[in-house]
Amino acid sequence: MKAIAIATVNANCLVTLAASVTAYVPQDVVVFLSGSRMIFPRHRTVVMDNDTTNFGDAYNKVCKAAFEEFDEIVVCNDDIVFTPYTWQTLSEDVSKLKGENIPLGWVACRSDYARGYQNIRIGKGKMEWFRWETENQIIQTEVIAPICAYVQKDAYVDFLPLNWYSDDVQCLMMQEAGKSHFVSRAYVHHVGSQTCGFDATNLIESAKPVIKEHRPDLYDLWFRKT
């Protein structure tokens, strides 16, 4: 893991993310940053303009730039905070899964603002030092959000030009290509919804035409009333 790919629009939380990367991520990791001219203090930073209009296209652009130099990257939202253990734990989990010869899709960090088992509030078993027992396990799942997530170049599939549902569609397309997704033991704090906002109705309606055009099967499954 030698590269981080970040896309931002308003950069509201970017200073905090940069501080945590500076403190906790190895210095030989390269940061690819779209949408800001900020240079991370201790890391080589490759900056580029973000001329896109949605999450999917923004991350396709910055990931493509990172993949020109590296075969595996960590995709990060601009509103997360690393802990002292995030990078090491994620790296350990990726190495373990590679050792099991699993065709990897995403290996995603847990968070306090995510869905399903990716959310630290959703767990099973007894509590161990303020954590659910399952938080110390790598869990296979169908869909993750790449809030902070590892992916290989040969596994990556372009996001559709979406804000909402981009994760769902892309994860499914990667599964269709034979890849498996996992939730790591690693954790990042996630502020959440800093770019797209909280207007769920508008975000859903905006996604429908794109999904209908590119994946009518999913449109029928998710939106067509019976």
What are these regions (language model features)?
Residues 130-151:
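A recurrent flexible, glycine/aromatic-enriched loop bordering the glycosyltransferase active site
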Residues 105-122:
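Short beta-strand-to-loop element that shapes/binds the nucleotide-sugar donor at the catalytic cleft/hinge
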Residues 70-81:
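Short beta-strand-to-loop acidic/aromatic patch adjacent to the donor-nucleotide binding site
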Residues 161-226:
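C-terminal catalytic/acceptor-binding lobe
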Residues 49-66:
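Glycine-rich, basic loop-to-helix element that forms the pyrophosphate-binding segment
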Residues 85-105:
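Conserved donor-nucleotide/metal-binding helix-loop-beta segment in metal-dependent transferases, i.e.
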Residues 10-24:
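Short, well-formed alpha-helical segments that are part of the catalytic scaffolds
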Residues 2-13, 34:
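A conserved hydrophobic helix/loop-capping motif in glycosyltransferases and polysaccharide synthases
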